[in-house]
Amino acid sequence: MQIPFSSSSSTSLGIEWELQLVDQQSRELRGEASGILHELRAKVGECEAAKAKHELFESTIEVITGVCDSVEEATADLSGTVSLLRDLAERRGIGLMCSGTHPASDYMGQRITEDHRYFRLVSQMQWLARRLLIFGVHVHVGVRSADKAMPIVNALMAYVPHFLALSASSPYWLGGDTGLASSRSQVFASLPTAGLPYPLEDWPGFESFMETLIVSGTIETIREVWWDIRPHPNFGTVELRVCDGLPSLMEVGAVAALAQCLVDRMNTQIDRGYRLPTPQRWLVQENKWRAARYGLDAQIIVDGRGGIRPVRDDITDLVEDLLPVAHRLGCSSELSDTLTILRTGASYIRQRDAARRAGGDLTRVVDTLLEEMNTGRPVVDG
């Protein structure tokens, strides 16, 4: 089975941001995506409205950038679409926010979007699909050829805990504290074609594996492979999907810059004849769990002998190493914002702080998330 790969500029960038529609009175999710998207099409036309689309549940809208040359361009693109949606949503008494999970809303009360693909997913996966009331950020970075795609996917697995720790924003599930930094990552990993990618050596290996999945009836299309990192042949990108939903535009820009810099450096290394390393899968699996459980306080395994290091320190050193790349790509400020996240705390920390100050009232958590979406920056109260 041949899967054409669309060549893409190595610095091109695209971002997908899954937003929650929240009732401003009850602070619970409200399923009104269809109405809002219909009004958006009427207001700006089909072309511009294509930057916002349905997801599995009617209480979610995904915002999508075009193909961008820089992080600054991508975040500006997102901001423009979010602004349009916010105006339409607020007329209905709905606010926009983002986090890996809603702190309290129950998945059993959510309406599924009327789409054959979603109905088929729920029919096949049943409870696993019905509880997918989770929200993420996906970052696409351009890759010049299919030959580079799988080596870059494999090498990026080493950074799964870094992205997850920075973005972790789902400590609550159905109104209770899970004890995790990212419960979303554990909910999503329950799907049989989600989680860590298989370390396939090259593009023919990827094509062969996809053919096996389709012939066996495991999937209908390769779009149904929801790995934490995957190649996207149609876009000519590598797509990082591991991140929890990020509440503020600043944080979205930070993880996008980190992704763009890493992929760009790997592109260059391949061009220079360097063979990218593929980390051992058991090590990545364990480090992903540690990031999901402990977030920025995780101690990740850094070698096959069991040596460990604080993920905070690894992120700090990684950012320093990538600053020359970021300077060339024009995203030094956004990359440095990853260090701001280390100082202020990732969203799971801020959410727990907000709940603690409110005596456990999770509506205060929702209010904080709504504010962060509106201001574009993390809210840190003393």
UniProtKB/Swiss-Prot annotation:
Reactions catalysed according to its record: L-cysteine + L-glutamate + ATP = gamma-L-glutamyl-L-cysteine + ADP + phosphate + H(+)
InterPro entries listed in its UniProt record: GCL_type2/YbdK_subfam, GCS2, Gln_synth/guanido_kin_cat_dom, YbdK
Signal peptide positions on this chain: none
Primary enzyme class: ligase
Keywords noted in UniProt: ATP-binding, Ligase, Nucleotide-binding
E.C. code: 6.3.2.2
One Gene Ontology MF term: glutamate-cysteine ligase activity
Superkingdom: Bacteria
Pfam hit, one: GCS2
A single GO BP: modified amino acid biosynthetic process
Chain's role: ATP-dependent carboxylate-amine ligase which exhibits weak glutamate--cysteine ligase activity.
Family, similarity comment: Belongs to the glutamate--cysteine ligase type 2 family. YbdK subfamily.
Record's protein name: Putative glutamate--cysteine ligase 2-1
Organism: Frankia casuarinae (strain DSM 45818 / CECT 9043 / HFP020203 / CcI3)
Lineage: Bacteria, Bacillati, Actinomycetota, Actinomycetes, Frankiales
